[in-house]
Structures are given as C-alpha cells and as structure tokens.
Curated annotation (Swiss-Prot):
Its EC number is 1.4.3.5. It comes from the Bacteria. Keywords: Flavoprotein, FMN, Oxidoreductase, Pyridoxine biosynthesis. Catalyzes the oxidation of either pyridoxine 5'-phosphate (PNP) or pyridoxamine 5'-phosphate (PMP) into pyridoxal 5'-phosphate (PLP). Pfam families: PNP_phzG_C (PF10590), PNPOx_N (PF01243). Pathway: Cofactor metabolism; pyridoxal 5'-phosphate salvage; pyridoxal 5'-phosphate from pyridoxamine 5'-phosphate: step 1/1; Cofactor metabolism; pyridoxal 5'-phosphate salvage; pyridoxal 5'-phosphate from pyridoxine 5'-phosphate: step 1/1. This is Pyridoxine/pyridoxamine 5'-phosphate oxidase.
Length: 196
C-alpha cells in the first residue's frame, strides 16, 4: 500500500529516485499531451528537466506543434510510464512559459550541436530534404564560430503547474492502486483513491 500524505511533490521525488536507482532507462522521459484549436489531440515524448516552483519543467521550440497547441490551450497532460516497476504518474495542469533567465541558464548547459540545432530547425515544419537541415546547421556553425551560441527567442521552457496528479501502482488481477491528489481552491491538496 502506497503511503499517501499531503505533498505530491515529495512522492514524485521519491518515486523518480527509485526509478533511477533501479536503472529504468530514461526515467525522466514523459509523454506530453496537448490539444489544438480544433480539439485534435497530439502526444510526444520529451524530457523532464526539473521540478521547481511547484511545477514540472520541460523545454522546446515555442513555434513547434506543441508550442502552438500550448499557446492555444495551455491545459496539458504529462505521463511517466515505468513498466519494469509497474508504476505510472499522470499529471494534469496548466503550462506556462518560464522566465527568459531560466531558459537562458538551461540553454547554456546544452551541447553546442543541440544549441545550433535550436537555431537551424524549423521544428514541425515541412522541409524539402534532410540535406537542407544539414546545410542550415553548417550555416549556423559558421555564423557562431568562436562565439557562445545565444538562445533563440523561439526556444525556451514551460512549467506545468498541476491541478491533479495520479500515482498508479500496478497490482495482480488488474486491481491497481490509483492515488489521486487534486488541487483545492486554497492551494492545498485533496487526496483520495480512484477505482482501477
């Protein structure tokens, strides 16, 4: 039985550390589900980079499919799935852009080729051929030769402020444990169990 208390972030931290300790590959990889202006859903895998200021932070291109979806409808759903230890964590909340200073600080830690790629790629747009992207990478490598690569204005982070977090624990006979935290109007958390 999962020991539920008042702080879902403590539970998340404990379970993430457990997944890493058990060598779950890319334990910080999560699905991010968004919905566009027509109500069409889309999902992709991204990396959780930090948990801070009461939210879950990931990065990407603001002009990408996910960026446009979030601009239109900032309510998103995140999901971590660790089948080797029979656990999932589902997070529903509102995605907000983080500060430019936070995005700058993280961008500075990225590998140089990843920094160049953020300039070269028109993420989610149609491209004529793979060599087109290679040429753009070469162009930006030349442009920033011998310089620190600055963060592009169209690239940065989002922080998902959760309204609900579900911790799912797989059990035999599909009688799984589902422990729910829901945000209350006073900023606290209501906890309850949900039927599997």
């Amino acid at each position: 039985m999962f020991d539920i208390n008042k702080d879902p972030f403590e539970h998340f931290d404990r379970l993430m550390k457990e997944a890493v300790a058990k060598q779950i590959p890319e334990a910080n990889a999560m699905s991010v589900a968004t919905v566009d202006e027509k109500g069409v859903p889309s999902v992709r895998i991204v990396y959780l980079k930090e948990v801070s200021q009461g939210g879950f932070v990931f990065y990407g291109n603001y002009n990408s499919h996910k960026g446009k979806d979030i601009e239109t409808n900032p309510i998103v759903c995140l999901n971590f799935h660790w089948p080797a230890i029979w656990q999932q964590i589902r997070i529903t909340g509102k995605a907000e852009k983080i500060s430019a200073a936070e995005s700058d600080a993280y961008f500075a830690t990225r590998a140089r080729l990843s920094q160049i790629g953020a300039w070269a790629s028109h993420q989610s747009e149609t491209i004529p051929a793979l060599d087109w992207l290679s040429r753009r990478v070469q162009e930006y490598e030349k442009q920033f030769d011998g310089q620190v690569v600055p963060r592009p204005p169209h690239w940065g982070g989002w922080r998902v402020i959760p309204t609900e977090i579900e911790f799912w624990f797989g059990l035999g006979g599909r009688l799984h444990e589902r422990h729910i935290y829901q945000r209350t109007e006073d900023g606290g958390w209501k906890t309850f169990l949900r039927s599997p």
